[in-house]
Amino acid sequence: MQGWKTIVGKLMSRYDFPLPDLSVQAEDKILGGVPTRIYTPPDVADPPLALYFHAGGWVMGSIDEEDGFVRTLCKLARTRIFSVGYRLAPEFRFPMALDDCLTVARSVLETYPVQSICFIGASAGGNMAFSTALTLVSDGLGDRVQGVVALAPVTVHPDSVSADNRDRGEYTSYEENDRLTINTGSAMRSFFDCYGAPPDDPRLSCLLHPGLGKLNKVYMAVGDADTLRDDVRLMRDALVALEVPVKCDEYPGYPHFSWLFPSPALREHQALFFGNLLSGICWVCE
């Protein structure tokens, strides 16, 4: 796992995409003991609120590594965003990261008592977005949960996928896309092992959460060459069955995190992705 951290750290230090938009005000604070960076869009009075949870398989990633991306979201969506520096596994195992996310969420809810929050995250951060929102719903705060925006999120542990889903061929992306994306099947297994959550715990496998039908709105996006493709499809289908308003964009041929690869060949794809993402955030927040 240390090798993964070293490789990704080198990549993130070499490439800074998108470039940080310095017109967005950023302030570092400690909320309830948790490092948090607060991004405020320029020239917007009383902007909507969102929490952002970075990617990294619960074992790596940081506020700094996704600073440029969150600044872009803040400005385009005209939303005040709180980026959460939650503790990482394996040093801090489940549910410590989730506890940090909930601490920041509750702090923001107390600071802005008349506003609801949109929960945004990518990959493992998408899992944190669902889990934080659903925990607040379970705690009777569903009216303060505006919705979830999850990009290629983990929604279920492979060991907790139902036999019916497997028999119908609805969970095959771990095998089909194993060598097509950075988050290979073996890498995902390592991430789950380090995180240490029981496979059937609904705070990890949010697809199984009893409060799923109480979410307000959900937007998701994923590439169909991603191992997490079927996590998104299963969550989409579950939300539809529960009559939760959901929108989902799928990108044929694209792997995990293609929206942030610094390649000129991906400019058209990334323009489409960011346009759809902006529409999704605005739809959830309206």
From Swiss-Prot:
The gene is stcI. One of its GO terms (biological process) is sterigmatocystin biosynthetic process. It comes from Emericella nidulans (strain FGSC A4 / ATCC 38163 / CBS 112.46 / NRRL 194 / M139). The keyword Hydrolase applies. The active site is at residues 123, 226, 256. Esterase; part of the gene cluster that mediates the biosynthesis of sterigmatocystin (ST), a polyketide-derived furanocoumarin which is part of the most toxic and carcinogenic compounds among the known mycotoxins. The first step in the biosynthesis of sterigmatocystin is the production of hexanoate by the fatty acid synthase (FAS) units stcJ and stcK. The polyketide backbone is assembled by the non-reducing polyketide synthase stcA by condensation of the starter hexanoyl-CoA and 7 malonyl-CoA extender units followed by cyclization and release of norsolorinic acid. A motif (Involved in the stabilization of the negatively charged intermediate by the formation of the oxyanion hole) lies at residues 54-56. Pfam families: Abhydrolase_3. It catalyses: (2S,3S)-versiconal hemiacetal acetate + H2O = (2S-3S)-versiconal hemiacetal + acetate + H(+); (3S)-versiconol acetate + H2O = (S)-versiconol + acetate + H(+). It is an enzyme of class 3 (hydrolase). Induction: The genes forming the sterigmatocystin biosynthesis cluster are co-regulated and induced on oatmeal porridge or the fungal isolates were grown either on oatmeal porridge or in YEC medium (0.2% yeast extract, 5.0% corn steep liquor). Expression is positively regulated by the cluster-specific transcription factor aflR that binds the palindromic sequence 5'-TCG(N5)CGA-3'found in the promoter. Its EC number is 3.1.1.94. Pathway: Mycotoxin biosynthesis; sterigmatocystin biosynthesis. The keyword Transmembrane does not apply. Transmembrane segments: none annotated. This is Versiconal hemiacetal acetate esterase stcI. Keywords: Hydrolase, Serine esterase, Virulence. It comes from the Eukaryota. One of its GO terms (molecular function) is carboxylic ester hydrolase activity. Belongs to the 'GDXG' lipolytic enzyme family.
